[in-house]
Amino acid sequence: MKTSEITEIEETTVTKKQVNPYIQAMVILLPSILALVASSATNVCQPNIAGYFGATQYEANSVITSYIIANGIMLPTTGYLAKLFGKKQFFLYCIIVFCIGAGLCLLAKDLHMLIMARIFQGIGGGCILPLCQAMLLDIFPNKKGFAMALYGVAAMFAPLAGPFFGGYLTDNWSWQWVFIVNIPLCLISIALIKFLIPKDEPVKEKYNKKFDIIGFAGIAVAMGCMQIVLDKGEQFNWFDTPWICWVTGISIFSFIFFYVWELEYKYPIIDIRVFKDKNFLYGTSISSIINILLYSTLLLVPLFSQSLIGYSPSASGLLMLPRAMVCLFGLLIMGEIAKLVENRLLTAIGFIIMAAACFMLSCLNTTASMHSIIIPNLILCFGVSVAFVPISALSFLTLPANKTADAAGLHALFKNIVTAISTSAASTFIARGGQVYQNNLVEHLAWHNPMYRVHLNALQHKFMMMYPSVVAQKKAAGTLYKQLILQSKLGAFYDAFLWLALMAIVVIPFLLLLKNKTKRIKAN
C-alpha cells in the first residue's frame, strides 16, 4: 500500500450532502443536552427517589454517582470507537443505549435495579458530549470559535438548566418524568441524525485489529475508584478511614499505569500523544479552571442560600436559572466576537470578570437579598461565556483534523476529573472551614468577655418577658451559639469565594503559553 493511501485511511472521509450546517449543528446538540440534563436533573429529585424506594439519602446518591462513573469510564473510548464505527454511527449507538437506559430506569422495581439502569444509561451518555464536540468541529472546520460556542451551549447551559427542569417535572408530576421525557426526544434525535448528518467511513484498517482491553480496564478502575472516594469520602471522614486510603491508592496507581500503557501500546484506546500539542495541553488545563469556577459556585451558592439565609430548595434552584440564561446568551454572541478580538485577550477578560464575580460573592452576608445573590452569579456566568469560547478554540487550533475525536475525549475526561475533585473539595472546604472558624470563635463565648456578657444579658431580658429566668438564660445562650455557628459558616464561604477569585487571577499569565495562529492563517 502506498504512503498516500495510508494517509487517506487515517483521515475520516465524509460523504457530502446539501444540508445546512446550522441545522446539522442543532440536530447534534439535542442529544448532547439530554445527556447532560440527565446528570444534573436527578440531583433535585434524589429525595423523592429515596422516599419512593424507602432508601436513605446516601443510598439514593448512588443513582447520581453510578451515572457519573459510567460516563467517566466511557469518555476515553470516544476516539477509538468513533474511528472504529465512524462518528455518525457511533453517535447513533450512544443515543440508542442512552434511550434504552432511560426506559430501564422507568421499569426499575427497586433501588438496585435503578442504579444498574443508570449505569447502562451512563454508558450511552458518556461519549455523546465529546462526539458532539468533534462533529461540530468537522461541520465548521474554518469556524472553530463558532463551533465551540455551540458546543458551549450544551456543555454549560444544560447542567445549569437541568436542576430547574428536574425540579419542575418532579414537583408537578413525579421523578419518573425526568426519564420519560428522554425517550421521545432521543427517538426524534435518532431520526434527524440518520437523515440529516452525512455518513463518515470508519477507519477499520487500523482500529479493528485489537481492542485495548488492558488500557480500558486501567482507566475504568481509576475512574471508578476515584468517584467512589469523592462520593463517600465526606461520609467516612476521608483518609481517616483505611479503605478510603486503599481505594485512593488503587485509583492513583491505575491512572499512572493507564498513562504509561497508552504511550507504549501499539493500538491504544486513546491517543495520549495529543498532549504533546502544547496548545491542547495548556488550553485543556485552563479550561478546567473555568469548570472549577463554574461548578464550585454552582454547589456553593445554593448551599449558602439554604444554610445561611433559609431559602427552600426550589427557591435556590430559581436562583440558578438566570445563570443558564446568561450562559446561553453569552455563548451565542461570543462565537462572533471571538472573530474580532484576539483569543488570549478575550480569555483574560473572561477570567477578570469571573474573579470580580467571586469577590462579590465573598461579600455576601446573612441578610443578603435575592438580587445581591443573583447579580454576581450573572456576572460570573457571563465571564464563563467570554472565556469558554476562545480557550476552547485555542485548545483545538493546532491539532490535525484526524486527532479531534481523541482530543475531544481526553478534553472531556480531564475536565470531568477536575470538576469532580473540585466540587468534592469545595464541599469539604465548607465543612472543615466552618469547624476551624467555630473553634476560634467559641473561645469568645466566655464570661470573661465583656461583649459576651452584654449580649447575653440583653437576650436574657428579652426572653424573660416570655419565659421563666432559667429558661430565658438557656435560650439566650442557645441563641448566641446559633449566631456563632452562622458566623462560622459565613467565614468558610467567604474564604471559599476568595480562593476562587484568586485562582481566576493567577491563571491569567499562563495564557501567554498559548499560541494564537489566527492572524497567520488569515494572512496565508
Protein language model annotation of sequence segments:
Residues 35, 64-67, 71, 98, ...:
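Structural signature of transmembrane alpha-helices in multi-pass secondary transporters
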Residues 160-161, 373-457:
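Small-residue-rich alpha-helical segments with characteristic i,i+4
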Residues 2, 415-504, 510-513, 522-524:
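Hydrophobic transmembrane architecture of multi-pass small-molecule transporters
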Residues 59, 143-150, 315, 403-410, ...:
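Cytoplasmic loop-to-transmembrane helix junctions
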Residues 184-202, 220-232, 250-264, 508-515:
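C-terminal membrane-cytosol helix-exit motif in multi-pass small-molecule transporters
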Residues 19-79, 83, 113-114, 174, ...:
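Transmembrane core module of solute transporters
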Residues 75-214:
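Helix-loop-helix hairpins in multi-pass membrane proteins, especially solute transporters
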Residues 46, 158-170, 334, 422-430:
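Small-residue (Gly/Pro/Ala) motifs that create kinks and tight helix-helix packing interfaces
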